[in-house]
């Protein structure tokens, strides 16, 4: 039992971070304090503030502390530790994806493209957008309004005539001389920039002025083009929310909570434009106060490695925050400018907050219905297999094209649904092309021949295939030499029916040595189909990426001494990949940056291919 009195005698009154561990040496809670001794002492009073705290204290085996120079530093360290340890009594943000931006590059003929990652390329970044779909929609809209190129430089540099985008009026063809002047092209780039900045009226004023000027010059064809562009821009503006206020860059957050599930709705507004919204479903311990949830979410959302998320000037929330000033100070330091957190707003900001609240409740209701359906299906599967509970299920599938670029997938489910952070793909190598049995053996060996923690051992392993696939899987498990209990998982084959139609699947249960034909309306079958389809889609998407990579690689990447710059030079000076392959040794050696020795290596490699 943890001796709190003895522990507290050595705790400092300095600011810092504390980590609480259970008897398995797992971090179960991370917290921070202005005064460590005062804060930690509060956990061991007779009357604790909540049932959550009571459960936490009952699980403590030992506590570690880390001193910091300030409370702000402690706040940052706390969020880093939460991300590292994922403690079960902390609120956990389960979404750690970076966010996409729109990038306006800095080059002679600037291009507009989507970008995700650190801002390492020169140019202007607009965003972040809530998801890739919002970026694609905006890029498609920009193409219709402003004929600015969106193609890759490798395409742009090797054009001898305009592409289809020019033919349909979505690019002005700066890649080919004589179609558009630099001045005209830069005018359209500037209009696109103003539009992305939310300066719609400036765009309209400019276009109206150009239309009137063209009319005065009797250039009615050009005036008509400006008229059409004005109508297109106005049509877009009319569909957008019109605000009488000048809205700053801001994120608006609202939380809905019901039946142990929380939804945080985040609305992104940049330069006066609503870029979209996104729902988050953080893992919330029972009996967590919603103000604590909001506070923790804000910190994790912006501070955990940034994840490509830009910190706006203003963050609007619908809960009072106890540590508002500390969060503002830390976010301001991270952003390099003043960042404010607003808990009470009026006007259009209030309307946006109400909209976020409505969306949060709607998204939560959808999630609750999905969770309810998942729970019913999960229980039906438990009943079917005569199992008291199923903690973890894994499913495997193989994908290839004529035996090439073979990829195996593993998807993971628990009673709440997919555990996408645990999904894995495996490259299959060293087998006869198209041998799915050998591929299944290899992926199972890769997955299970290593040590597994207790909570990572699956209760059920679904094999997408019939008796042949299942027997290979059983053979792999029979020969596994591992410390964990390899007899625990139930191996189940999911064979397609006679007509290979959904709903006619046959379950082959290895431990019970029986086959089950389930009716179309079986909830257990619906769950198995969901898991199987998820595995199938995961395998196919991985295979397509691998196939596309093999298709687009030029062969130059594998040659020692040929990096990205030399590859670009070869393609540029010799007219693309076919030009490089047809080039003589002397022609390759004439490319800037290519030595005679390297030219010989390139020539021999491509000749042998």
From Swiss-Prot:
- What domain of life? Bacteria
Q: What is the protein name for this chain?
A: UvrABC system protein C
- Asked whether the UniProt record includes DNA damage among its keywords, one would answer yes
State the Pfam families in the record.
Answer: GIY-YIG (PF01541), HHH_5 (PF14520), UVR (PF02151), UvrC_RNaseH (PF22920), UvrC_RNaseH_dom (PF08459)
Q: Where is the UVR domain?
A: 201-236
> Which NCBIfam families does its entry note?
PRK00558.1-5, uvrC
Tell me the compartments it is located in: Cytoplasm
Q: Which GO terms describe its cellular component?
A: cytoplasm; excinuclease repair complex
Q: Return the InterPro entries for the record.
A: GIY-YIG_endonuc (IPR000305), GIY-YIG_endonuc_sf (IPR035901), GIY-YIG_UvrC_Cho (IPR047296), Hlx-hairpin-Hlx_DNA-bd_motif (IPR003583), RuvA_2-like (IPR010994), UVR_dom (IPR001943), UVR_dom_sf (IPR036876), UvrABC_protein_C (IPR050066)
Q: What does the UniProt keyword field contain?
A: Cytoplasm, DNA damage, DNA excision, DNA repair, Excision nuclease, SOS response
Record the organism.
Haemophilus influenzae (strain ATCC 51907 / DSM 11121 / KW20 / Rd)
A single Gene Ontology biological process assigned to it is:
DNA damage response
Q: Which GO terms describe its molecular function?
A: DNA binding; excinuclease ABC activity
Q: How does it assemble?
A: Interacts with UvrB in an incision complex.
């Amino acid at each position: 039992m943890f001796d709190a009195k003895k522990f507290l005698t050595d705790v400092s009154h300095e600011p810092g971070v504390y980590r609480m561990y259970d008897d398995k040496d797992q971090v179960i809670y991370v917290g921070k304090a202005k005064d460590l001794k005062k804060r930690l002492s509060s956990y061991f009073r007779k009357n604790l503030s909540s049932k959550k705290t009571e459960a936490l204290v009952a699980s403590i085996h030992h506590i570690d502390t880390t001193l910091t120079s300030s409370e702000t530093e402690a706040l940052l360290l706390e969020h880093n530790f939460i991300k590292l340890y994922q403690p079960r009594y902390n609120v956990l943000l389960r979404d750690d994806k970076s966010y996409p931006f729109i990038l306006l590059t800095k080059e002679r003929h600037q291009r507009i493209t989507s970008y995700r990652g650190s801002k390492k390329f020169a140019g202007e970044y607009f965003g972040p957008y809530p998801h890739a779909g919002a970026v694609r929609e905006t890029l498609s809209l920009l193409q219709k309004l402003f004929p600015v190129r969106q193609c890759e430089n490798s395409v742009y540099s090797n054009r001898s005539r305009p592409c289809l985008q020019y033919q349909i009026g979505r690019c002005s063809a700066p890649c080919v001389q004589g179609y558009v002047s630099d001045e005209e092209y830069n005018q359209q780039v500037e209009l696109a920039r103003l539009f992305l900045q939310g300066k719609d009226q400036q765009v309209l004023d400019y276009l109206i002025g150009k239309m009137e000027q063209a009319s005065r010059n009797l250039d009615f064809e050009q005036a008509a083009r400006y008229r059409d562009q004005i109508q297109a821009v106005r049509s877009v503006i009319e569909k957008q929310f019109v605000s009488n206020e000048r809205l700053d860059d801001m994120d608006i957050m609202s939380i809905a909570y019901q039946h142990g599930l929380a939804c945080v709705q985040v609305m992104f507004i940049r330069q006066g434009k609503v870029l979209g919204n996104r729902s988050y479903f953080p893992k919330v311990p029972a009996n967590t106060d919603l103000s604590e949830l909001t506070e923790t979410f804000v910190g994790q959302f912006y501070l955990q490695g940034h994840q490509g998320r830009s910190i706006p000037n203003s963050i609007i929330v619908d809960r009072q925050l106890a540590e508002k000033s500390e969060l503002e100070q830390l976010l301001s330091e991270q952003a390099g400018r003043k960042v404010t957190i607003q808990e009470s707003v009026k006007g259009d900001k209030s309307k946006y907050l109400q909209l976020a609240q409505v969306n949060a409740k709607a998204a939560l209701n959808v999630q609750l219905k999905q969770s309810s359906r998942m729970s019913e299906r999960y229980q039906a599967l438990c009943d079917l297999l005569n199992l008291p509970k199923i903690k973890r299920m894994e499913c495997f599938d193989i994908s290839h094209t004529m035996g090439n670029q073979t990829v195996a997938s593993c998807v993971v489910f628990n009673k709440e649904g997919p555990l996408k952070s645990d999904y894995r793909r495996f490259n299959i190598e060293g087998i006869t092309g198209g041998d799915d049995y050998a591929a299944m053996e290899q992926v199972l060996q890769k997955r299970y021949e290593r040590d597994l923690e207790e909570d990572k051992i699956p209760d059920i392993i679904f094999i997408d295939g019939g008796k042949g696939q299942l027997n290979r899987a059983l053979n792999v498990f029979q020969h596994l030499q591992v410390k964990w209990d390899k007899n625990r998982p139930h191996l189940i084959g999911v064979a397609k029916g006679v007509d290979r139609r959904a709903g006619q699947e046959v379950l082959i249960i290895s431990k019970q040595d029986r086959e089950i034909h389930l009716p179309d309306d079986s909830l257990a079958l619906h769950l198995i189909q969901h898991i199987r389809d998820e595995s199938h889609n995961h395998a196919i998407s991985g295979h397509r990426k691998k196939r596309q990579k093999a298709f687009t690689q030029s062969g130059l990447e594998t040659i020692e001494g040929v990096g990205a710059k030399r590859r670009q030079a070869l393609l540029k000076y010799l007219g693309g990949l076919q030009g490089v392959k047809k080039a003589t040794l002397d022609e390759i050696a004439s490319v800037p940056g290519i030595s005679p020795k390297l030219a010989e290596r390139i020539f021999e490699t491509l000749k042998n291919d």
